[in-house]
Amino acid sequence: MTSASTNDSLPSRLNSDPQREQLMAQVAKLYYDLERTQGDIAKETGLTRWQVARLLREAREVGIVRIEIIPRSPRLPHLEAEMQRRFGLREAIVLASSGDEDVELNVVTQAAGRYLAGLQPPPQLVGVSWGRTMIKMAQWLPPRWNDGVHVVLLNGAINIRNVAEQTNNVAERFAHAGNGHATLLPVPAMLGSERTREALEQDHIVADVLRIADEAPVACFSMGELSERSVLVESGYVDAAIMRDLEKRGAVGDILGRFVDESGEIVAPELDSRTIGLRPERLRDKAFSIGVCVGESKHRVARACLRARYINVLATDEATARFLLEHGDE
């Protein structure tokens, strides 16, 4: 069969998806494993170079080929082992510090994404919180990381202020990457009154979401810093004055939108009574409660999380791990 006849018989889109995926795999093996050029592959298969390039691109898009960028910052097994021993963790994921917090956020969230995607057996139900760190983690999840996964949002996440960076569509992103579906909590994280929260929790739709969040065997979340950079400030739930008052009252950050002190205890009952979503103490019942945090601004809230045993898996940077090991008992 000549190249011309093969090209003429090959439609621009094969009718059979399995047939096309088999061709993607064949071309990808030649290109990546056997290191053939696209020109050589075109001659060998009877395709055009344009068709070869398109098949390689589609192979990456559907997950047949996965290109993983290995960060220069390696995991630090000696610190990980010490963290596990000291704090009774199922797993510690510690990445070398680079001095650049943006770089560290990338490598830590990438490692956390690999850990979540590698859980065996793959969890069918995963709970996630919202925020910048979780958005970043979702970006690193491999395509089809958990085919058909059900992702539920752990806390309310409707922004009451229009912000440039959308941090509240985390569940959809986790689910999309896993070819699954998301269940959202379509209410603000913090309501105007305790009575409003109680009324919403009686609504059968909201109650069902809260039940699913409680039943999820895996929870993945980031601790929030106590500063004007907090997503709770940027989203309009609290202002800088409230943050300063919380600091005076002993708050070190937030967990699932609830402000806690050095021991992980709720600091502001008047705010907590208006907050909707999974309570931090319910994290202790999860098979995998995965906390992800990077940077000095989250040192104290990470320590609070460990003290209260809200997490049994921690993904973080080297500097944070060393702080926790040196000051965990203070």
Where are the model-predicted features located?
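HTH-adjacent hinge/linker in prokaryotic transcriptional regulators
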Residues: 11-18, 50, 55-127, 138-148, ...
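Glycine-rich beta-strand-to-loop/alpha-helix junction loops that act as flexible
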Residues: 128-133, 294
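Conserved beta-strand termini and adjacent loop/short-helix elements that scaffold enzyme active sites
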Residues: 94-97, 154, 185-187
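Structural beta-sheet core signal
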Residues: 128, 151-153, 184, 291
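Short Gly/Thr/Asp-enriched flexible loops that form oxyanion-binding sites at enzyme active sites
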Residues: 133-144, 231-241
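Conserved phosphate- and dinucleotide-binding cores of soluble alpha/beta proteins
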Residues: 2-28, 32-41, 46, 51-57, ...
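A generic alpha-helix surface/boundary motif
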Residues: 35-36, 77, 110, 132
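Short, hydrophobic/glycine-enriched beta-strand segments
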Residues: 127-128, 218
